[in-house]
Amino acid sequence: MTGQGAPNMNEEKVTFPSDGLNLSGVIATPDGLQPGEKRPAMMVLHGFGSNKDAGGCVEPCRMLTAMGYVTLRFDMRGCGESEGEKARVICLEQVADTCNALTFLAQHPQVDMRRIGCMGSSFGAAVSVYAAGVDERIACVISAGGWGDGVSKFRKQHPTDEAWARFTAMLEEGKRHRARTGQSLMVPRYEIVPIPEHLRHNVVKGSIQMFPAETAQSMYDFRANDVVAKIAPRPLLLLHPSQDSVTPTEKSIG
């Protein structure tokens, strides 16, 4: 389906495959493209348990399309309108979704496959960096409010000894529950990533509120730091609010 998006752009709802699942996305192209003309493109990744219609995806896509880029925003597996086990958010699976999105976008007739970048915020920022570290096709990366080491990030987000003991006990109980029942232990999102009460109204409408404990474990084990050096000499821009109340600023690089 093709339709008029924001001024100076056209949007098309798309689906594409990722590990046997169909993912839902939106491609936006700038007005005025000439037949056969190819433009650089950017993939814009959503945050933790969010979706492609979040402002953090929609607004960057509008800005980039106004600048002449083709953009793709999409729902990761298990999120939004995409297929997959709902609420199962696993870091390395999202990396795979990102690489498969690139394969799809590279086939677009108005995209220069040599100039496809990736950007994301928060969880999507960490996934963007990791994906670029393992997939040389990604030409550049913009990370906004991301994190490089899951253990270090969580230690800052659960800062007291009591909070850390509670969090790590949840991880262990998740493993025992899975072994005992064959089912996932479901955990509220704010027990994984604490967000101050006064900021929770900013969580995107439709965001997932309960996750399997395996989600928290995958984040705990995730280390974009291990692959970030492989991005060079491709450009990498790390952005982070100086007073981030959710992901500590220094976690963008450590």
Q: Where on the chain are the PLM-derived regions?
A:
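N-terminal cap/lid segment of alpha/beta-hydrolase-fold proteins
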Residues: 2-37
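Short beta-strand/loop motif that positions the catalytic acidic residue
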Residues: 231, 238-240
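Catalytic nucleophile-loop/oxyanion-hole region of alpha/beta-hydrolase
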Residues: 52-54, 79-117
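The serine-hydrolase catalytic nucleophile loop
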Residues: 49-62, 76
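Conserved alpha/beta-hydrolase
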Residues: 61-81
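Primarily recognizes the serine-hydrolase "nucleophile elbow" in alpha/beta-hydrolase
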Residues: 100-181
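Accessory cap/linker subdomain of secreted extracellular hydrolases
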Residues: 145-219, 224-225
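Conserved alpha/beta-hydrolase "acid-adjacent" motif
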Residues: 245-251
